[in-house]
Amino acid sequence: MMAEKVTIGNCELWHGDCREVLPLLPPCDLVLTDPPYGIGDALVKGGRGGSFERLISANAAEWDVTPEKEVFDLIFGHSKNQIFWGGNYFEIPPTKKPLCWDKVRPNQKNLSEWEMAWTSFTGRAQMFKHCANGGFVAAEANEHPTQKPVPLMEWCLSFAPEARTVCDPF
């Protein structure tokens, strides 16, 4: 697929494979993203299954494939700072400032109670508490099967107040 650029106000939205799009962009101040964790791989291999599989959808194997190392190399080379949700699933250097989202939910059979973000920042680990409906976005339009709450993303942006350009390659 050929990369396509769409301008929305003073923002650019690129539609295409991040391996093709990132080299076209100037370096950015922050990559804030929630890369695919490989849930699709788990479903294909008979992972969680059950209600979780129905919730995520049968086609997760098509869109939720763990990114290759070259994608992370592109991101590191194209950005000053990074925040990767699900960073504990990827082969990247250890973080010196992990972030945690406590979903404020009782134990769920097949969903995590919290999620970790890998960051390029240094300092103490920090936690954000936001109630989610069964681990998913509460009281917000759920436009994506693994959507993060807007307040969580706003909190993430607070760690890079000087960032003028933010990229989400996924």
Residue ranges and their predicted role:
Residues M1-L32, E162-A163:
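SAM-dependent nucleic-acid methyltransferase catalytic core
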Residues G16, T66-P67:
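Short coil/turn linker and secondary-structure boundary residues
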Residues E70:
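Surface-exposed ligand/attachment interfaces on beta-rich extracellular proteins
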